[in-house]
Regions:
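Glycine-focused motif/segment detector
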Residues: 1-197
């Protein structure tokens, strides 16, 4: 489907259908967490699913979590190379936010090295961050790695408009308490607003 087709399901004429879809999924997956955070997390999952889809069919999957996970696997199994333009734009974009890098208590927050690393880390962590290469290259979002003592990425952080909008560990898990404290410390030091984890 790709990012160009994401606008279609979010068109104003589809608003009621979209809200009904998300509310049904929210009650299915987040019965224990019916709050704005759960709603936002589900919307992000749906958006990511739509970005990774190659076709326009099944924009309202009956099981969003399974459909998202399958789309993620399919995305990483595609043998796509990045164009020279995307590669160069990506490299230029990440240089613009090197100032967000940070170290604390053995953890490191750093920029991705290149688009290939984005795809490789996303596949390893089983998260869809590899689908964000174009968004980083177009400077519409910033992705950083949360790394362990050996500089191995253990999570991905998304920053938009000076706000942390996502922090995902392997398999889309939320950070544990220790990691959450590192992220909060980083946000405070870099003057980022925590909009969501």
């Amino acid at each position: 489907m790709g990012i160009k087709h994401v606008e279609k399901p979010f068109a104003s004429t589809e608003f009621i259908k979209n809200i009904n879809y998300i509310l049904k999924r929210m009650f299915k997956y987040y019965e224990d967490r019916l709050d704005p955070e759960g709603f936002l997390s589900l919307l992000k999952m749906w958006r990511d699913y739509l970005i990774m889809k190659e076709d326009e069919e099944d924009i309202y999957p009956s099981n969003l979590k399974i459909a998202h996970d399958e789309a993620t696997k399919e995305f990483y199994n595609r043998n796509e190379d990045f164009s020279l333009d995307v590669y160069c734009n990506f490299k230029n974009a990440i240089k613009c936010y090197e100032y967000l890098e940070y170290e604390n208590n053995g953890y490191k927050i750093r920029i991705p090295r290149d688009p290939c690393e984005m795809k490789k880390v996303g596949k390893k962590l089983n998260i869809c961050v590899g689908a964000y290469v174009s968004s980083v290259a177009e400077k519409t979002t910033k992705i950083l790695w949360l790394c362990n003592r050996n500089d191995i990425p253990i999570g991905a952080l998304e920053v938009k408009d000076n706000q942390l909008v996502q922090a995902k560990m392997a398999n889309n898990h939320h950070p544990n308490y220790e990691v959450e404290q590192i992220i909060k410390s980083w946000c405070k030091k870099k003057e980022l607003i925590i909009a969501s984890f």
